Amino acid sequence: MKKILILVLFAIAITSFFYFDLGSQLTLANLKEQQAAFDAQYQAAPFLVIGIFFLVYVAATAASLPGALILTLAAGALFGVIAGTIIVSFASTIGATIAFLSSRYLFRDTIKARFGDRLKAIDEGVEKDGPFYLLTLRLVPIFPFFLINLLMGLTAIKARTFYIVSQIGMLLGTLVYVNAGTQLANIDEVSDIGSPGLLLSFAALGITPWIGKWIVGLIKRRKVYARWTRPKKYDRNMVVIGAGAAGLVSSYIAATVKAKVTLVEASKMGGDCLNYGCVPSKALIKSAKVAEQMRHGDVYGLNKVEPEYSFKAVMQRIHGIIADIAPHDSVERYTDLGVDVVKGYATIVDPWTVEIKREDGETQRLTTRSIVIATGGRPFLPDLPGIDEVGYVTSDTLWEEFAKLDDIPKRMIVLGGGPIGCELSQAFARLGAEVVQVERSDRLLAREDDEVAELALGAQQSSGVEVLTGHDAIRCELVDGEKRLILSADSKEKSIAFDALVVAVGRSARLSGFGLEQLGIETDRTVVTDDYLATLYPNIFAAGDVAGPYQFTHVASHQAWFAAVNALFGQFRKFKADYRVIPWTTFIDPEIARVGLNEQDAKAQGIAYEVTTYQMHELDRAIADSATQGFVKVLTPPGKDKILGVTIVGDHAGELLAEYVLAMKYKLGLNKILGTIHTYPTMAEANKYAAGEWKRAHAPEGLLRWVERYHSWMRR
């Protein structure tokens, strides 16, 4: 109601201005004719005239009415340069701020609801460089004054910042036009003031903030490097620390463009994904899925059987798969590609020097123009009393430790309700272990929507996992030789016996042991980088888990391109790391794959959306495969086919998601997916049918009624 009242008042003010032709009074000719009368009134009652003039100026600018330039000239003619400049400076800034706040109050919520995804990107830019943009616009008076006020109100810039920057930015222009007003008799046209030379001067002045920002950045960079001595020449163009996904891709790119690059790895080539994460876990999941299908053979018209297997053979298969993939990431392959691969520990001695302690005990120092930190992450270990006494494995160490066992641990506890915890819990339960999965929050997969988390819970339970959400692990105990985990829930303690404790509560970046502290490179759970993945030192970059914000192998590879290209060619052009379309998959059965926004994200960001859902039990191929659990859920702006985000639950969801990733990357809407031929019968048809559901919901009902009449007429 308040918004409507304010809009009505603005409408009355604007209508009155044009209805009573008040604009005809705000002309240069009328101002010159009335100057003598205005002077007389000012001499008779100076404070009253100043007060009225001030309020009129504020009202005119607040309502975004034309005539501000004439009023500014009038201030010079009436009050002189100093007084006129002061009056106009405050009146114009106050009026502009009122217009700014009115725009924000009246329109921001509506604009945010409709264009929230775009506004978020603008707000992020405004938060970083907003004052510079605003100052530039204010310094160059060719940009419409009222438009700046209204548009800035739609952004997240603070009102105080808007006021201060506006007053400073408009001061010089105000002074020029007020001073021109003191020579009113010599001005025949307003264009006499805004000569091309003057406007060019304002434009040059407008870039001053950016020049200043560049100078400040230059001084800051020189200050950062001040205590170090730059080498006269370099041994390498780039040194990469860490041979996981980010390190391998960074060094590969450098070698491809003929740069001289050294890749340093202290442990196994391929990093966590090959040796401890993605590859072994997916191999385990496959064995477990086959075992589960054997138990439910009757679903496929076969006899159901309890699988007999050797746990040691399962673990040997996993290590065999790692060995089969290892040549893809081997020292030999990357050496053949042109990368100098060194096995050893790297320490950054100064911004251009890396010291390497080789496996053979020798120490080598290399100077380099740029460094890429790709040291990855490690499992996070909670501060749990007694955990060292009872023993534990992490998602990294279990592959080596369990390979030593003849049989699967009978009783297992998995700490963690995220993707890793869910995948391991389900897999080990399907292989016959009694698994208890413990999660301190009230549901699994906290980043997913409620219905997805509920489906994941059902999948875990149907696989035999006992899921305890809302339980906090508080200590471990060894009682009469039996290992026990003590949990707390609802102020009550619960004790669970176990044979193996798997810790899967997340991962943390590897930040110590290679010189960050000595160089003063800032860290905050990850290495702090700018939009270009550069650290405090512009020639030192970070990529992968150590840089965040996502801990996915494919994101590490994605970041590696930006880190390598910016490190090698940043002096010509730099590229901001692009996180607009990041997919991920949780590989439980059924798989959960997502890209972009889900409902809880959209609600948190205040983005208006529509939901289109297609159930897998309606898909022919899913029915044929007896894999009908799941759905495709697409978020779009109201009334538009633009894809904001997609969640797919079902068989091969990770593969199905790729079509939506491509569509979002290249701004293809649901209409394009609907118009694409999909092979029958495939799971991929679910994507087309989801697009069809959206189209059906947005059918032009009015037009269809006329089409129906047409067909009825044609049957006569």
Where are each of the predicted segments found?
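Membrane-interfacial helix-loop-helix
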Residues: 13-53, 89, 93-149, 154-155, ...
